[in-house]
Amino acid sequence: MTIKSHVLRGLLATAVASLVAGPALAANIFVIGGKPDDPFWSRVKKGAEDAGVVAEAQGGSVTWLGPQNYDNLGPDAAELIRQAIDQGADAIVGPDWVPEAMDPAFEAVTAAGIPLVIYNAGGLEAADKLGAMNYVGAVDYKSGFAAGEYLGNAGHKNGACVNTLPGAANIEAFCSGFNDGIIAAGGTGSVLQLPATAFGDATAVAQAVRAHLLQNPEIDAMFAIGDGDTNATVSGIQQAGKAGQVHVCGMNFSDTILANIQAGSQDCAIDQQGYQQGFFAVSILNNYVNYGVTIPTREILTGPGIVDASNVELVIEGVKAGVR
């Protein structure tokens, strides 16, 4: 049995037992996440809310707080963390997207004696630095590295990472990992950096990709940081007349991305299993607040995994259910 299986079985067993026994203290858990129309974060939110069913049955609650956009990501997220403290959170979950802006707010969480789990961004290093109980998520650098290595090993040697959230530590790590991965496979890597306002703007991303490819015809591989940006990157490649010549891998996926992988217009997607990030983080804190239960495996990894033509059919049902 894998470590992940042990962790999942432990969480589920504790959740069932806690429903029978009844809580010592109802946990009001606040979760900091992405903006409302971000497809990846909708899956994270579903995971948090599904875990919240147990918390609510015990008289607790799960409250989701997210920014309206990513234009001022670090300061906006820090303000959401402070709001959670002010609203009397018993426990807080949050990603360490922009450490220089967000770490003082996280430090205020632990200084107030509020249990904290870092998820999605920051890794165990951030959890250690901030005094968090656990880190739940993928290792961002390794996710990018997996994409670069995959495309490089497939024979594509000139890669570019499309970064639409400059300054976000996890996105910078994606791109750094991608470049190192394709270099390790004998290629070269670079970054196409766009302003944060371009994130989720399909037209802006597609136009930028088209222009970049026309200016840099040697590029034959691209990596995008989210499912919306990946779709836009595929569109930009097509607009540049480079379909079949420039190969794409992206973070996360959706119905459209899986269809693109089936059709051959996208090579792979990196799966960080956002649903599990939300589910595990909330479950850990609910059990801790109510019963003092801890998970000794402090780094709970949900990725990276690779979805490509070899396993895409197995993933489709999970996407239909809204959990992958």
Model-based region annotation:
Residues 2-12:
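Bacterial N-terminal signal peptides that target proteins for export
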Residues 20-26:
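Sec/Tat signal peptide C-region and signal peptidase I cleavage site
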Residues 33-45, 62-77, 97-98, 121, ...:
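Hinge/beta->alpha junction and helix N-cap segments in small-molecule ligand-binding domains
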Residues 82, 90-111, 178, 197-260:
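Hydrophobic alpha-helical
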Residues 99, 104-142, 252-267, 316-317:
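Flexible loop/hinge segments that line or gate small-molecule binding clefts
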Residues 166, 170, 182-185, 190, ...:
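Hinge/cleft segment of the Venus flytrap/periplasmic-binding protein
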